[in-house]
Amino acid sequence: MPFEIPFLVPILIVILLLVFFSLVPVGLWVTAQFSGVHVKISQLIGMRLRRVIPKNIINPLIKATKAGLNLTTNQLEAHYLAGGNVNTLVNALIAAQRADIELEFERAAAIDLAGRNVLEAVQVSVNPKVIETPNIAAVAMNGIEVIVKAKVTVRANIERLIGGAGEETIIARVGEGIVTTVGSSESHTSVLENPDSISKTVLNKGLDSGTAFEILSIDIADVDVGRNIGAKLQTDQAEADKRIAQAKAEERRAMAVAKEQEMIAEVRSMRAKVVESESKVPLAIAKALESGNLGVLDYYNMKNIISDTEMRQAISGNSEKIKEDDK
């Protein structure tokens, strides 16, 4: 029994040391102390327990302290737990200090948590950024298409980074201004001769209102002549009118054919009535003979007249046929 206790003491010491070094990054603590950042070991243990990686807080804090910024571990840890990028935040604060831009920690943290790249915003505030628009097609009043490509120089407005519109809005507004300016030009030649008029007109519209940027200049990079939209529209209209006329003509033809068929049916109906009436003639003659209204002599005289008429018709028909054959 007395031999077991001394044997367990070294094991317990080793276990305690392992637990201590797993909870406390001693190397990071030593680095912080020599860098002028006074961090307690209890603070590092608390970070471990809160599942915060100590180096993600201490290293940016060392950088900020060396740059002359007055930050605390609580500020950085709170920003880290909120989902922010501590390293980018500290770099942005250092860059703003060097560029003599007023940027407080709370403002920078809010910008970072809003999803903006606060470091890029500070850099664009110092060094303006050039946004290149895609090819923008606009049509002048004479119907000629003009294709314009512009370069917009912007500077970030840190005060409007939260809630301000981004680059897409700038590009859309510039494109709208170009289309409006070209559309109000009487001809495409005036646009080609003086492209600066586009940039001046668009720049005076205050397109950066409500955005996170301040437009410094709008430069026309390229101007090309596109299609003749006016002529194309006239051609399309003529083709449409032609198809409408053809459709109306086809409708009239169909109505004429239908009318012709109606007339043919009407003629056939009248012929049927004539045949029906002719079929009643012998019956009427028989009734007249039976009733005494028509004599036998009168009947034969009528037959002779009918035969004579048929003979004359046959003779006239043959003579007309002979004349046609002679021709």
Swiss-Prot record:
User: GO CC annotation: what is one?
Assistant: membrane raft
Report if keyword Protein transport is assigned.
no
Does the keyword section mention Transmembrane helix? yes
Keyword annotations: Cell membrane, Membrane, Transmembrane, Transmembrane helix
Instruction: Name the InterPro entries on file.
Output: FloA
List where the protein spans the membrane. 7-27
Q: Could you tell me what this protein does?
A: Found in functional membrane microdomains (FMM) that may be equivalent to eukaryotic membrane rafts. FMMs are highly dynamic and increase in number as cells age. Flotillins are thought to be important factors in membrane fluidity.
NCBIfam families named among the record's database cross-references? PRK13665.1
Homology family: Belongs to the flotillin-like FloA family.
In its UniProt entry, what is this protein called?
Flotillin-like protein FloA
Which species does this protein come from?
Finegoldia magna (strain ATCC 29328 / DSM 20472 / WAL 2508) (Peptostreptococcus magnus)
- Gene encoding this chain? floA
